[in-house]
UniProtKB/Swiss-Prot annotation:
Domain of life assignment: Eukaryota
Quaternary context: Component of the nuclear pore complex (NPC)-associated AMEX complex (anchoring and mRNA export complex), composed of at least e(y)2 and xmas-2. Component of the SAGA transcription coactivator-HAT complexes, at least composed of Ada2b, e(y)2, Pcaf/Gcn5, Taf10 and Nipped-A/Trrap. Within the SAGA complex, e(y)2, Sgf11, and not/nonstop form an additional subcomplex of SAGA called the DUB module (deubiquitination module). Component of the THO complex, composed of at least e(y)2, HPR1, THO2, THOC5, THOC6 and THOC7. Interacts with e(y)1. Interacts with su(Hw) (via zinc fingers).
Similarity field: Belongs to the ENY2 family.
Name under which the protein is recorded: Enhancer of yellow 2 transcription factor
Coiled-coil intervals, chain numbering: none
Record flagged with keyword Transport: yes
GO molecular function, one term: transcription coactivator activity
InterPro entries reported in the protein's UniProt record: TF_ENY2, TF_EnY2_sf
Gene from which the chain derives: e(y)2
Native species: Drosophila grimshawi
UniProt KW Transcription keyword: yes
Amino acid sequence: MTICDTVDQYTIMSGDRLKIKDLLCNRLTECGWRNEVRLLCRNILLEKSANNSVSVDQLISEVTPKARTLVPDAVKKELLMKIRTILAETDEDN
């Protein structure tokens, strides 16, 4: 089991996963990331639909790498700090 799997499993069991997910969604909305990704999807669909239809899986595979690079470093750092805080609190409790 990797560190990521362990952290993921712990956050699910402790109930903190939902808090982290909500924080992420809020920050991505606040910084405009969701709108950027929506625009990216729209542009890809317009580009590809001229030739043929695009499946959801094709759209996801094309958008995901680009969308990940658009996540601001500040959001990544904030989430990492939140996860570290949760793990540190757990370590102190044990």
